[in-house]
């Protein structure tokens, strides 16, 4: 969680802890607070069910899914000026069907010949946010 939170904070985003919970204990753990290097204190945190928030957010929602479109396909639209939402599920269960119904862009990190099916959530978040923001920057030039 701390590595993911630092990446989210760097991009000026909010975080929904534990990907669809109203349970604040995950962020209050001493190890999480310490390893976030203070970044946790500068991050907007939403404590409500993710599906409820997505239903009214009015922004494009990107979901990291194994059957998504490759980020390198050239056809994934970049985030809008109003921003976007990136949803990353856990490695075992993925993104719940309740949350998937709000995803407007199903994306994936292409596999370049390796055999790994998925990545650590923090690593996936870093790659996905960098690629999505790079697409936004390139489009505006």
Language model features by range: what are they?
Residues 11-14, 24-41, 97-141:
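Structured adenosyl-cofactor binding patch, chiefly the S-adenosyl-L-methionine
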Residues 58-61, 80, 123:
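Short, surface-exposed amphipathic charged segments that create phosphate/polyanion-binding patches used
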Residues 50, 54, 71, 78, ...:
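Flexible domain-boundary/linker segments
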């Amino acid at each position: 969680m701390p590595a993911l939170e630092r990446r989210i904070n760097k991009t000026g985003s909010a975080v929904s802890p534990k990907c669809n919970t109203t349970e604040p204990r995950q962020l209050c753990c001493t190890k999480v607070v310490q390893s976030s290097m203070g970044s946790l204190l500068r991050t907007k945190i939403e404590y409500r069910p993710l599906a409820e928030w997505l239903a009214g957010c009015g922004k494009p929602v990107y979901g990291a899914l194994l059957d998504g479109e490759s980020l390198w396909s050239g056809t994934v639209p970049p985030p809008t000026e109003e921003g976007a939402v990136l949803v990353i599920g856990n490695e075992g269960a993925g993104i719940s069907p309740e949350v998937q119904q709000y995803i407007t862009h199903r994306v994936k990190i292409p596999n370049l010949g390796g055999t790994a099916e998925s990545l650590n959530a923090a690593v996936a978040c870093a790659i996905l946010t960098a690629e999505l923001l790079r697409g936004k920057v390139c489009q505006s030039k």
